[in-house]
């Protein structure tokens, strides 16, 4: 099976070590999906794992959510771009100077790594935001941070399916929307609060859909990934 155009499905390799991550990758088709490497796996397995995933034909989203002083984040983003990853991300809460430094660092590197900003984590709800000093509904914070990311020269934002449509309406299709919290109908919620099915996420305007446990914990990960990729393609 193949899908038209570049794959929009991103499979989250949320594993504690390289061996199970690579075993899962061996069952997947790079024509159907990209792969996401997060903090735990990257800390344990390092850039060498990313290089091995590249050798299998996969494009990699390096999901490390950098948030530090501008110079430090710029250096980290430059290193990610030099590694050849498809996408890297930062926290929009790092502020304009940090976001601009990150965007400039990626733009100056060889190749074309996309850079996106995390707005509000999908594990956060209004009560959680209030605890950290961000009063109001998550949607308001997401839109404010998405605008900051766009003004700072980033390619897109990481947002929940709930806010994707509002971001598109306000900022246009040119700002990519990368969406975790995607679950097929009937799947367990896990630690996500603001979720949607793949078809609903596409209908909301999401460009890239990140799916983890519904694929990685499936009895047949290849079949699960193919089914979700087909649902995404059918939805638009």
UniProtKB/Swiss-Prot annotation:
GO cellular component, one term: cytosol
Keywords from the named record: Decarboxylase, Lyase, Pyrimidine biosynthesis
EC annotation from Swiss-Prot or TrEMBL: 4.1.1.23
Residues that hold substrate according to the record: 14, 36, 63-72, 122, 183, 192, 212-213
Gene3D superfamilies (UniProt xref): Aldolase class I
Positions of the catalytic residues: 65
Pfam families: OMPdecase
Pathway(s): Pyrimidine metabolism; UMP biosynthesis via de novo pathway; UMP from orotate: step 2/2
Biological processes per GO annotation: 'de novo' pyrimidine nucleobase biosynthetic process; 'de novo' UMP biosynthetic process
GO MF term list: orotidine-5'-phosphate decarboxylase activity
Reactions the enzyme catalyzes: orotidine 5'-phosphate + H(+) = UMP + CO2
NCBIfam families: PRK00230.1, pyrF
Function recorded in the entry: Catalyzes the decarboxylation of orotidine 5'-monophosphate (OMP) to uridine 5'-monophosphate (UMP).
Subunit structure: Homodimer.
Protein family per UniProt: Belongs to the OMP decarboxylase family. Type 1 subfamily.
Name used for this protein in its record: Orotidine 5'-phosphate decarboxylase
Organism, as annotated: Halorhodospira halophila (strain DSM 244 / SL1)
């Amino acid at each position: 099976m193949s899908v038209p155009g570049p794959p929009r499905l991103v499979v989250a390799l949320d594993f504690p070590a390289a061996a199970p991550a690579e075993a899962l990758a061996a069952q997947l088709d790079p024509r159907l999906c990209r792969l996401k490497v997060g903090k735990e796996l990257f800390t344990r397995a390092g850039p060498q794992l990313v290089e091995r995933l590249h050798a299998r034909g996969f494009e990699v989203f390096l999901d490390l959510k950098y948030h530090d002083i501008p110079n430090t984040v710029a250096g980290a983003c430059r290193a990610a771009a030099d590694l050849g990853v498809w996408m890297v991300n930062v926290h929009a809460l790092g502020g304009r100077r940090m976001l601009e430094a990150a965007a400039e660092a990626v733009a100056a590197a060889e190749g074309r790594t996309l850079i996106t900003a995390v707005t509000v984590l999908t594990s956060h709800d209004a009560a959680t935001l209030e605890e950290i000093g961000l009063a109001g509904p998550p949607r308001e914070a997401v839109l404010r941070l998405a605008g900051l990311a766009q003004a700072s020269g980033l390619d897109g934002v990481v947002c929940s399916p709930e806010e994707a449509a509002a971001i598109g309406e306000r900022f246009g299709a040119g700002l990519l929307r990368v969406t975790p919290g995607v679950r097929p109908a009937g799947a367990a919620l896990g630690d996500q609060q603001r979720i949607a099915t793949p078809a609903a996420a596409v209908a909301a305007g999401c460009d890239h859909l990140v799916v983890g446990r519904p694929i990685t914990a499936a009895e047949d990960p290849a079949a699960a990934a193919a089914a979700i990729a087909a649902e995404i393609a059918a939805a638009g």
